[in-house]
């Protein structure tokens, strides 16, 4: 987020297609792949150490996953998909960064700053002055500012504003809305997965990791889901007890979680 300057964004837009094209040229270089394949196919006769075998397998699979075994026509299709994906993913990130910089919470009453760290308050005052709002405080939903507000702000309405501002990032129907980017990325990822012999992009993404299959990964997640939810419910119950005991007078909501988690932890 700290690098989200117009200059850095312009540089990323210039370099992204170059980096993508270079990567494709490496992974779809037939002469280079054939050398890797020769070592891979004859690993048993070459006296490779376990580490060398592992490295050979790793690079062989990486090249295959990036289109080394595709026909020339399919490689051209994959290159086109990769180029479009790179542009869309960069647009997605730029939209998020632009939203973080331009969608913010303005505070004009110092009483609402209770509980916030001085560094956060000072930074918000400077940002407000930079935006022509001297005497006020501007809080963006950047990670450091957002967490400071959600964790420390005694003003519940400020926590709620910050939470909702963050949750609406790049999803407000304006020029930075990422809905179209997301839909286009999903379609292209599916095309890429099928081109490389996978049923879905999830299957493609999970293939090189320990779980190996989408079902295995889903089963793993579901196995920890119930105990995780139970633990969170217990934590929220403790927070609610603390809130009730200190006269909060409301039910704990998402924007209250970090604040009361810190209060309970400090007891």
Model-derived regions: residue spans:
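N-terminal helix-rich structural modules
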Residues: 1-118, 123
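Alpha-helix N-cap/helix-start motif at coil-to-helix transitions, marked by capping-box chemistry
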Residues: 50-54, 153-156, 183
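Active-site-proximal, well-structured secondary-structure segments within enzyme catalytic domains
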Residues: 55, 84-87, 94, 98-140, ...
């Amino acid at each position: 987020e700290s690098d989200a300057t117009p200059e850095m964004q312009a540089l990323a837009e210039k370099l992204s297609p170059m980096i993508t094209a270079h990567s494709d040229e490496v992974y779809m270089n037939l002469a280079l792949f054939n050398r890797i394949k020769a070592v891979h196919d004859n690993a048993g006769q070459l006296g490779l150490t376990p580490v060398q075998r592992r490295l050979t397998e790793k690079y062989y699979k990486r090249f295959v996953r990036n289109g080394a075994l595709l026909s020339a026509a399919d490689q051209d299709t994959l290159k086109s998909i990769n180029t479009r994906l790179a542009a869309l993913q960069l647009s997605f990130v730029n939209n998020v960064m632009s939203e973080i910089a331009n969608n913010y919470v303005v505070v004009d009453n110092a009483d609402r700053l209770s509980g916030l760290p001085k560094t956060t308050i000072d930074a918000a005052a400077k940002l407000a002055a930079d935006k022509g709002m001297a005497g006020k405080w501007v809080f963006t939903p950047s990670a450091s500012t957002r967490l400071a507000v959600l964790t420390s702000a005694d003003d519940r309405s400020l926590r709620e504003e910050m939470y909702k501002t963050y949750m609406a990032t790049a999803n407000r129907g304006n020029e930075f809305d990422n809905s179209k980017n997301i839909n286009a990325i999903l379609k292209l990822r599916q095309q890429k997965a099928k081109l490389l012999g996978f049923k879905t992009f999830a299957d493609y993404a999970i293939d090189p990791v320990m779980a190996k299959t989408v079902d295995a990964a889903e089963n793993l997640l579901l196995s920890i889901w119930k105990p995780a939810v139970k633990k969170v419910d217990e934590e929220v119950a403790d927070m609610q007890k603390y809130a009730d005991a200190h006269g909060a007078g409301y039910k704990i909501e998402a924007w209250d979680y970090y604040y009361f988690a810190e209060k309970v932890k400090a007891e």
